[in-house]
């Protein structure tokens, strides 16, 4: 599901040049349209996640994926800036609640002590989508027009259709909570439920469980600022990675750039496996998150200043860090929030954080124009990454319940 989600997020980056040629969209209009998705996505996040909490993941995840797949398919009909803006706004409404819904859903099933590595496995979806999605998008873009449909239109049609199919599959596959899992043996189910209930009670005693009061909790606001800056870093890479790689290769965005764009995400896949597991093993999520962001920030500074080899190496380090730090981050709010505060609070953090995806391309364009330097925007985003490393150093880190040690290893 997450692979398909990120395919949908990334295809707009691959379609940038084609949209500008076919639909007459300027750099500024592209940046605005790419970012508008996050406005409606943020507005509808909280109500969507509360609905999921009430009616269950199976039905709601199906609704989200089918609707966003249909809207994504509709992007093939973009004919100018206005239609591009409208479809990006509709896509934000359709996809709202997917990501925080998954984070909430995993908190129903996995205790604190193993949640980092579980979230790391979930986050495999991002680099996997870029590893396979980059070449796939490049191949589709390079297709000659068939039946009056150009390559970039085939890309949106094919990848949107995948979301519809996976959404229907999710309806029949997902179970809402462990208590509903008929495949889980009785003793294991009871042990898991006991651990999860003990942690829920601990969160109610020491964390926050009331919504909407959680929105004024200083820790939640701290988490939100951190996640906002993480998303600025992530989307600064996602939206511009294909065109930046094309620039230093001296190519147009197509098959070769698609394969080259997959290299940083192969590195990110390895990092997303190893870093969260290491953090869970040593229970040092905060320290590793600070280290990862600091290294990624310095790598981002090297990217625009280096040779093609150094630039590609810097992209590999930055992409790895920006993806791998996210499962570490989500262990903080999920160990602090309980009940409806978890549903609303996680959605709030993700909703405001997702606005980083709106500000990243626009901040990059502003900095490039203001300082009359193509790499100024990348330096700005790199600096914000280093600031974020400092913010994480002061984050509140929830405590695992000792009973979770008894859980079977994953």
Describe these PLM feature segments.
Residues 24, 56, 77-83, 94, ...:
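Helix-breaking motifs and short loop linkers at transmembrane-helix boundaries and internal kinks
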Residues 87-124:
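Cytoplasmic helix-loop-helix junction between adjacent transmembrane helices
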């Amino acid at each position: 599901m997450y692979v398909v989600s990120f395919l949908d997020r990334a295809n707009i980056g691959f379609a940038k040049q084609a949209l500008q040629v076919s639909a007459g969209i300027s750099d500024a209009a592209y940046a605005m349209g790419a970012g508008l998705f996050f406005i409606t996505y943020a507005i509808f996040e909280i109500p969507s996640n509360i609905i999921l909490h009430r009616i269950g993941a199976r039905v709601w995840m199906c609704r989200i994926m089918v609707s966003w797949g249909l809207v994504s398919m509709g992007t093939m009909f973009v004919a100018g800036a206005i239609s591009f803006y409208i479809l990006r706004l509709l896509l934000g409404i359709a996809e709202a609640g997917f990501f925080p819904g998954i984070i909430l859903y995993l908190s129903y099933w996995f205790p604190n002590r193993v949640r980092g590595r579980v979230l790391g496995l979930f986050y495999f979806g991002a680099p996997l989508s870029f590893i396979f999605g980059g070449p796939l998008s490049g191949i589709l873009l390079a297709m000659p027009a068939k039946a009056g449909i150009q390559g970039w239109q085939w890309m949106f049609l094919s990848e949107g259709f995948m979301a519809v199919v996976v959404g229907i599959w999710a309806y029949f596959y997902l179970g809402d909570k462990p208590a509903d899992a008929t495949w889980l043996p009785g003793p294991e189910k009871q042990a898991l439920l006991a651990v999860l209930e003990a942690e829920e009670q601990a969160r109610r005693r020491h964390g926050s469980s009331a919504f909407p009061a959680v929105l004024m909790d200083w820790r939640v606001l701290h988490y939100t600022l951190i996640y906002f800056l993480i998303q600025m870093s992530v989307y600064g890479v996602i939206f511009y990675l294909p065109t930046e790689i094309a620039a230093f290769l001296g190519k147009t965005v197509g098959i070769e750039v698609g394969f080259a764009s997959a290299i940083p995400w192969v590195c990110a896949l390895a990092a997303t496996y190893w870093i969260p597991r290491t953090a869970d093993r040593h229970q040092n999520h905060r320290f590793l998150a600070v280290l990862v962001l600091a290294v990624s920030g310095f790598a981002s500074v090297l990217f625009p200043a280096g040779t093609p080899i150094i630039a590609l190496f810097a992209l590999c380090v930055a992409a790895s860090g920006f993806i791998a730090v996210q499962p570490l981050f989500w262990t903080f709010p999920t160990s602090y929030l309980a009940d409806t505060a978890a549903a609303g609070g996680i959605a709030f953090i993700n909703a405001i954080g997702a606005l980083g995806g709106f500000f990243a391309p626009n901040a990059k364009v502003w900095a490039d124009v203001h300082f009359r330097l193509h790499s100024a925007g990348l330096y700005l985003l790199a600096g914000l990454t280093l600031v974020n490393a400092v913010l994480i150093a002061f984050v509140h880190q929830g405590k695992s319940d000792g009973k979770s040690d008894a859980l079977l290893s994953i």
